[in-house]
Amino acid sequence: MNDNLNKVEKMIGHTPLVCIEYKYNNIIRYVFAKLEWFNLTGSIKDRSAFEIIKDAYKTGKLKESQPICEVTSGNMGISLCSIAKVTHNPVIICIPKTMSIERIKLLKSFGAKIELLDNFPQCFEKANEYEKQGAYLCKQFENKSNIKAQTKTAKEIAKKLDNVPTFVSGVGTGGTLIGIGRYLKKKYNTKIIAIDPKEAKLLTCGKSQGKHKIQGLSDEIIPKLYDKTIIDEIIEIASDDAICMAKKLCKDLGLNVGISSGANFLGCVLSGEQSCATVFADDNKKYLSTDLTNDEIKSDFIDNIELIKYSIV
């Protein structure tokens, strides 16, 4: 089992870091973004899923053939399914019906047992039932292995950049923002900015105020991993603006990013900072059935952002 995990580890991490040069309000600025779709299954969640499974085996909490269960908006589930194939663990996924059909079909293609439910609270309730029946519940919203995985991402960023003045990221489980943010703040005194879907206002209100379309962010609860003591600012991004920004990154630069990446990039723009680092958590292939391909979605101020070029750092 360990040998198989070691093989998988070689296909996770060490993703490209690009520097995107853009102009906003006639000022040239820069965003340094990790392209996380270069991971095993195409998302940043491969890092967390690997670390969670590895640590669970190491501590004896997970054994071969034992079912793995998780609540997910999609990417973590896909990552778990792939990695669990080499450890010979069946996977049970509890996912809201509102997630993209591509995510659900991908989960089915791995042979996962899927529980489609109305919302995240129902997903957590169902997952707890499976845990009582003997499944290993990953609990990515509170599992410190999630933080550990993204600390490695932070170290990859730090290896490429002499300084990181600002780091911007959305919050789903909190693993990415806190894992990367905490390390960078300690090393560089980096300003940490959290992205909150404008329709939900979860981080500012403590409870979701409405539905949004940025899958992977604001999953109806503030995760236990979220550490507000390291957060310097919260920026709200409207779903349609995030979608338009993701489309623009693809159309103008050829960077085929997912919706949350559009939100992260916009957060960098609206921060007013000269230089920001962020992550592009996945690509656009899981969102082709969503408004990401809807030409009627418009954003007035996105046109004021001129994407000039990108280079590999």
Please report, for each region that a protein language model flagged, where it lies by residue.
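PLP-dependent amino-acid enzyme catalytic core
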Residues: 1-313
